[in-house]
């Protein structure tokens, strides 16, 4: 499974968790159960390849990180979505931008440009019209970090 596919899977997990309220660990483990995962493979290509144990750890870390920082990430999305109330942004696009903002702030081995490009790719995959919107918000966020580097949050070590 590529990192891009793992990122898309993380989007599905975070999105689904918003409806169930499960802990990040629960949502990852439950969605990766044999029967459930195989059932999803019939609908989504990314589920045709099972993640390795290392990739499961990555998914757990990224889902937990986004959930832990969700309020901060929503504030970022809100700050840069000028003229939009965060609640009016579709839940899926909000989750896509939360994940990208989390990677930009807290994941050292993901360059900012990759996080933005992947978010745009995922937004377009699910809603072709949202690519520019997501790019605009995340691009403004990245530019603000370059203009005010003291505002950037410290990186969290990966486990």
Model-derived features: where do they sit?
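N-terminal interaction/assembly modules
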Residues: 1-159
């Amino acid at each position: 499974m590529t990192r891009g596919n793992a990122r898309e899977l993380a989007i599905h997990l975070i999105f689904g968790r918003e409806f169930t309220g499960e802990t990040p660990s629960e949502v990852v483990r439950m969605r990766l159960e044999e029967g459930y995962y195989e059932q999803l493979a019939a609908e989504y290509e990314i589920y045709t390849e099972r993640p390795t144990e290392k990739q499961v750890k990555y998914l757990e870390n990224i889902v937990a990180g986004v959930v832990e920082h969700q309020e901060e990430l929503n504030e970022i999305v809100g700050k840069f979505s000028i003229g939009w109330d965060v609640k009016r942004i579709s839940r899926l696009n909000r989750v896509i931008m939360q994940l990208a903002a989390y990677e930009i702030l807290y994941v050292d081995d993901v360059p900012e440009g990759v996080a933005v490009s992947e978010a745009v790719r995922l937004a377009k995959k699910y809603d072709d019209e949202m690519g520019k919107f997501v790019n605009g918000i995340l691009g403004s966020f990245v530019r603000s970090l370059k203009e005010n580097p003291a505002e950037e949050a410290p990186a969290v070590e990966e486990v």
